[in-house]
Amino acid sequence: MTMKQEYGENGIKDFLKKSLDSYLSSRQFSFKPERSLMDVETGQYIWYEKGSMIMYDLQDVMGEDRVNTGLKSFLDEFKYFEKGRYASSEDLYNALYAVTPDSLKYKVDDGFKEIVLYENRVMDAKTTALDNGKWETTFTVNSKKIYYDDTGKEKLVDEKENLVDVGLFGEDETNEDGITVKNPFYFELMWLSSGDNTFTIITDKKPLKAGIDPYNKLIDRNSDDNLKSVED
């Protein structure tokens, strides 16, 4: 991922956030039924904004090298028109699916075949100073993944566990490129159950905010509640 290599995971947050907001806004006002990424014919907000978020999420959970292996296989198979036909989105899906570990194949299906929106938010967060100078923070996040049909109607709430980032953060910083970046004290990609998930984490410094999917890697209906101030 060229942008991640150039700006880092912190620096790419603005791009992901803008892609998310553009996709959500466009789908809200579109007069056409929404198609999945695999089936879409027109609609920049799907094949560009949504597509960029899906590809970023895939390399994030299974590694950039594995995604690149799938892309190379896809390109090698269809180079020079040797197969006598142009590649399709299904061919790209198959190439990525083939290199994806079984536990993560749902990510490829969700991204290419389904219309999925998350509802992630931080419910509460409280920290306490310990005698050894460290801080113990307990916070609860709520995660919900919903499948929609092409008319925008909810058809299924996923009750299985899903991979979602959670973290504790200090005050935002400015990097050498002048970009505002997050300052994580704790950050992990976790398997979250549908509904409330509570964590107790000890950090060296006092956290100011708790977050779920704080870098907006997932397509969340309202990403503004993904961060919450930590109370004393």
Language-model regions, residue ranges each:
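Hydrophobic alpha-helical and helix-loop surface patches within well-folded domains
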Residues: M1-F139
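Long, contiguous hydrophobic alpha-helical segments, chiefly transmembrane helices and signal peptides
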Residues: I54, G111, V164-V166, A210, ...
